[in-house]
A protein has these predicted regions:
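Alpha-helical scaffold segments
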Residues: 1-238
Length: 238
């Protein structure tokens, strides 16, 4: 049987989706296709109820899909990441916005693989062009990959920030660092009079999302600390 065929024919059925999403060995590309089906179903529902406009519902769906793609790519290993990139390209989801989100999220493997796929260049050549500090090589690579030139300043600023502040491995650290990355890129792009307004709008959305995620992680950690401390206080009181 084919996972893709099942998703295509029955992915709109909640029972089928839930059963498949509960499988530990479900390929990431198939999992993302199911998430896309669910997102489309929810978008159609809220638009039909006139709770959201079709434009806003579509934007929310795209952002949710992109976040899911980044999360799945982070948990993928080896060929799974490559298959996920192929799926993203085949479904029109391998966009400049997704690739920029991957870079700002610290997922350098997805970022590199996406550019390898879109440019048609071998991975070692892409790596050499990406990290050539001259600047023109990066523009040439992004152009070959078919990304809009209006997004180049953000990619350049993000790579510079990556080289300057790097990434750390903990969940909490990644949240803080991601916010620093986004804010640094946004600040640099806002200072450039040639940067397009749509790019600034996208970066501001990323900034809001990263700040919200950092606050969530902080609150989760605070609650966990309180839970850990409570039994000790009870023993002392006794």
């Amino acid at each position: 049987f084919s996972w893709d065929r099942i998703v295509e024919r029955h992915g709109h059925l909640a029972a089928i989706r839930e059963s498949m999403l509960g499988l530990d060995d479900l390929p990431p590309a198939t999992r993302l296709a199911l998430i896309a089906k669910l997102s489309d179903t929810l978008a159609q529902f809220v638009v039909a109820r006139r709770w959201l406009s079709s434009d806003r519902a579509e934007r929310i769906v795209v952002e949710a899909r992109d976040r899911s793609a980044i999360n799945l790519a982070t948990r993928s290993r080896g060929d799974e990441t490559g298959q996920l990139v192929l799926h993203l390209r085949a479904t029109g989801q391998l966009t400049a916005g997704l690739i920029l989100r991957a870079l700002l999220s610290g997922n350098l493997e997805l970022f590199d693989r996406a550019l390898v796929e879109l440019s048609g260049l071998p991975s070692h050549r892409v790596a050499a062009l990406l990290y050539d500090r001259g600047g023109s090589s990066l523009d040439a690579l992004l152009t070959r990959a078919g990304l809009p030139s209006s997004t180049f300043p953000a990619f350049r600023a993000a790579l510079d920030a990556t080289n300057e502040i790097g990434f750390v491995g903990t969940i909490d650290g990644a949240a803080r660092l991601r916010r620093r990355m986004v804010e640094r890129v946004l600040t640099r792009c806002e200072a450039d009079p040639d940067v397009s307004e749509p790019l600034l709008i996208l970066l501001r959305r990323f900034a809001t999302e990263s700040a919200r995620e950092e606050a969530r992680v902080f609150c989760d950690q605070l609650v966990a600390d309180v839970i850990d401390i409570a039994p000790e206080h009870q023993r002392i009181a006794a």
